[in-house]
C-alpha cells in the first residue's frame, strides 16, 4: 500500500474484564485511522488505556468487541497461526524495559527473532550486524546487555524489532527509563528509521517533546480518545 493511504482502521473497539462482580472497561468505543508512514503519539495519564490499545492494535491481546483492520483485513479473523504469522511479518515492538536476554550478546539478541523465523544463521547474523550498524552500535556487537548503557540497550531493542523488516513499529514508552539527552538521541534515531525504512510509528509516551515532534498526537482518558 502506498505511503499516506489508510493502513490501520479501528472501529468501535472495546476491551473489558470482570473483577469480582464488577465489569471494568479498559477501552470504550475507540475509533481511529492511521495512515501508512504516519507517526502517531498516544498520550494520557497512567491507566488511560494507551498500552491496552497498543497491545490490541499489535495483535498481542484481543478486544472484547470491535474491529482492527490492516489494509481492510480484520486481523482477528485470522485462523490458527495466521495472527502470529501476520504479527511476525508486519509488526515490530519496543518496550520501556528492553527485555534483552542478559546472557546473549547484542548481536545474538538481534539475531534471535530471525532464527525463530527459521532464517539461516548466516542470514540472521548478516541482518543483525547491518541493523546494529544502522543504530550506531557497530563497535558493541559482542557486548552483553549488562555491559551497555541504557540508551545502547534500547538501540539493541530497536534493532531487534526491525530485523524482520516490519511495516509498523509499536513503541511503549521507549524513552521512559532514560535521561533527557539519551531520550533525545532515541527520538532522533526513530525519526531517521521512519524516513529510511518508511515505517509507520505508533508511540505510547509521557514525553511531551517526543510527542510534539510526531505527525499526530492522540489524547486518551478513561479508555476513550479525547482528542
Curated annotation (Swiss-Prot):
PROSITE patterns: ABC_TRANSPORTER_1 (PS00211), ABC_TRANSPORTER_2 (PS50893), LOLD (PS51244). It is a peripheral membrane protein. The lineage of its organism: Bacteria, Pseudomonadati, Thermodesulfobacteriota, Desulfuromonadia, Desulfuromonadales. Keywords: ATP-binding, Cell inner membrane, Cell membrane, Membrane, Nucleotide-binding, Translocase, Transport. It holds the Pfam family ABC_tran. GO terms for molecular function: ATP binding; ATP hydrolysis activity; transmembrane transporter activity. InterPro entries: AAA+_ATPase (IPR003593), ABC_transporter-like_ATP-bd (IPR003439), ABC_transporter-like_CS (IPR017871), ABC_transpr_LolD-like (IPR015854), MacB-like_ATP-bd (IPR017911), P-loop_NTPase (IPR027417). This is Lipoprotein-releasing system ATP-binding protein LolD.
Amino acid at each position: 500500500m502506498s505511503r499516506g493511504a489508510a493502513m490501520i482502521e479501528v472501529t468501535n473497539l472495546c476491551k473489558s474484564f470482570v473483577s469480582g462482580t464488577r465489569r471494568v472497561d479498559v477501552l470504550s468505543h475507540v475509533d481511529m485511522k492511521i495512515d501508512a508512514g504516519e507517526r502517531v503519539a498516544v498520550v494520557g495519564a497512567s491507566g488511560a488505556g494507551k498500552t491496552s490499545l497498543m497491545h490490541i492494535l499489535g495483535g498481542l491481546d484481543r478486544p472484547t468487541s470491535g474491529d482492527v483492520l490492516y489494509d481492510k483485513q480484520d486481523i482477528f479473523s485470522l485462523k490458527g497461526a495466521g495472527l502470529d504469522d501476520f504479527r511476525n511479518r508486519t509488526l515490530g515492538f519496543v518496550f520501556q524495559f528492553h527485555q534483552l536476554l542478559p546472557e546473549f550478546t547484542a548481536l545474538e539478541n538481534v539475531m534471535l527473532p530471525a532464527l525463530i523465523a527459521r532464517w539461516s544463521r548466516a542470514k540472521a547474523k548478516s541482518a543483525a550486524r547491518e541493523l546494529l550498524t544502522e543504530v550506531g552500535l557497530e563497535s558493541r556487537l559482542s557486548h552483553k546487555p549488562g555491559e551497555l548503557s541504557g540508551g545502547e540497550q534500547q538501540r539493541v531493542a530497536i534493532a531487534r524489532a526491525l530485523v524482520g523488516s516490519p511495516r509498523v513499529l509499536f513503541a511503549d514508552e521507549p524513552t521512559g527509563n532514560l535521561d533527557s539527552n539519551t531520550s533525545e538521541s532515541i527520538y532522533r534515531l526513530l525519526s531517521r528509521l521512519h524516513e529510511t525504512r518508511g515505517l509507520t510509528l505508533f508511540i505510547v509516551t509521557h514525553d511531551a517533546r517526543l510527542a510534539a515532534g510526531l505527525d499526530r498526537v492522540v489524547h486518551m482518558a478513561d479508555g476513550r480518545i479525547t482528542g
